Amino acid sequence: MALLHSGRVLSGVASAFHPGLAAAASARASSWWAHVEMGPPDPILGVTEAFKRDTNSKKMNLGVGAYRDDNGKPYVLPSVRKAEAQIAAKNLDKEYLPIGGLAEFCKASAELALGENNEVLKSGRYVTVQTISGTGALRIGANFLQRFFKFSRDVFLPKPSWGNHTPIFRDAGMQLHSYRYYDPKTCGFDFTGALEDISKIPAQSVILLHACAHNPTGVDPRPEQWKEMATLVKKNNLFAFFDMAYQGFASGDGNKDAWAVRHFIEQGINVCLCQSYAKNMGLYGERVGAFTVVCKDAEEAKRVESQLKILIRPMYSNPPVNGARIASTILTSPDLRQQWLQEVKGMADRIISMRTQLVSNLKKEGSSHNWQHIVDQIGMFCFTGIKPEQVERLTKEFSIYMTKDGRISVAGVTSGNVGYLAHAIHQVTK
């Protein structure tokens, strides 16, 4: 009270001698942002924060979207370390990159995605720009659609899709819709529902497709299903917008993972494509990605490139150099590229092995449920089919953290904790 009283006295004295001070204090106390509400927490980051606070030695974080080794530790690829050493030895400068990014990186990215002998590359009827990882590629693509896709503002996403797809396209001014994709009854691909919904999409709309390792379900169409989807997309004159964040990381074979993209192009469908090197090179914090537009001819590609640069310039001017140099060094050095391909396969194989071990351990626990979908799904993520109330029990009783929809990151499962996970899942689902 004494302090409060003295504060009032001092304030009064200051006002008496300096009337302007009171007005200044009042001005400082007012706010421009009183109307701004607290935003909701990110669901995945919220899982990580809760995990960090848990003191249980057996705790598991199955929400994180980053690869972990079999000890549960972050993994830097040896090929990345070698590339970094080679770059450091060159003593390169830190000058700005061009607006479109590192030229050799862009060329190598297009070759990785489309195949080195692809007709599109030989004819030059494409443009690839370096972006700030996959998210940046999506945003550049969304903004390009908003400005130049004059036919429609409608973008159709698979249901469900990566959570960031909606705000990226919505904030770029596009209208979001969905088509059936995941079947919760089978924990697999709703092929019939997808075809039915795609057939009803208005002509000249945009359809977003996950090239491989669908996030969050881990459910991918088979090649024969992709063929039917491509036929329908072409027949209905839809624009195919591919998101490929996991090339090589899904099956362990980069060509296999890019099959859908290449098939669509072979069928005469001019697509656009987003790439990320976060997962398949472990360059999460380097933010390395690319955005490619396949065009009618080389002249059209030049015009599209000029407008992509105009979009990029006020957004971030030009992309960062370090990650692009790492990726480019790996992709353009035959020995490093071969080593990297083996390392990517090793990461993919570990995740596939963890899926198999989890199902095997569930059977050992005596689970009567059919867990085949865990093995059938592909990539980092798995839609387990576990219900929200069961997820809550896993967290409270076993310190196992995941998103409420039952999605787990298989990268967080190791040979040391897979048995514990299987036991916990059995306990809450029996």
Curated annotation (Swiss-Prot):
Its main location: mitochondrion. It catalyses: L-aspartate + 2-oxoglutarate = oxaloacetate + L-glutamate; L-kynurenine + 2-oxoglutarate = kynurenate + L-glutamate + H2O. GO terms for cellular component: mitochondrial inner membrane; mitochondrial matrix; mitochondrion; plasma membrane. Its cofactor is pyridoxal 5'-phosphate. Pfam families: Aminotran_1_2 (PF00155). GO terms for biological process: 2-oxoglutarate metabolic process; aspartate catabolic process; aspartate metabolic process; biosynthetic process; glutamate metabolic process; lipid transport. InterPro entries: Aminotransferase_I/II_large, Asp_trans, NHTrfase_class1_PyrdxlP-BS, PyrdxlP-dep_Trfase, PyrdxlP-dep_Trfase_major, PyrdxlP-dep_Trfase_small. The modification 3'-nitrotyrosine is found at Y96. The modification N6-(pyridoxal phosphate)lysine is found at K279. Residues 1-29 form a transit peptide. The modification N6-acetyllysine is found at residues 59, 73, 82, 90, 107, 122, 159, 185, 234, 279, 296, 302, 309, 345, 363-364, 387, 396, 404. The modification Phosphotyrosine is found at Y96. Substrate binds at G65, W162, N215, R407. The modification Asymmetric dimethylarginine is found at R313. CDD domains: AAT_like (cd00609). Keywords: Acetylation, Aminotransferase, Cell membrane, Lipid transport, Membrane, Methylation, Mitochondrion, Nitration, Phosphoprotein, Pyridoxal phosphate, Transferase, Transit peptide, Transport. It comes from the Eukaryota. Catalyzes the irreversible transamination of the L-tryptophan metabolite L-kynurenine to form kynurenic acid (KA). As a member of the malate-aspartate shuttle, it has a key role in the intracellular NAD(H) redox balance. Is important for metabolite exchange between mitochondria and cytosol, and for amino acid metabolism. Facilitates cellular uptake of long-chain free fatty acids. Belongs to the class-I pyridoxal-phosphate-dependent aminotransferase family. In eukaryotes there are cytoplasmic, mitochondrial and chloroplastic isozymes. NCBIfam families: PRK09257.1 (NF006719). Homodimer. PANTHER family: ASPARTATE AMINOTRANSFERASE, ASPARTATE AMINOTRANSFERASE, MITOCHONDRIAL. This is Aspartate aminotransferase, mitochondrial. It comes from Sus scrofa (Pig). The gene is GOT2.
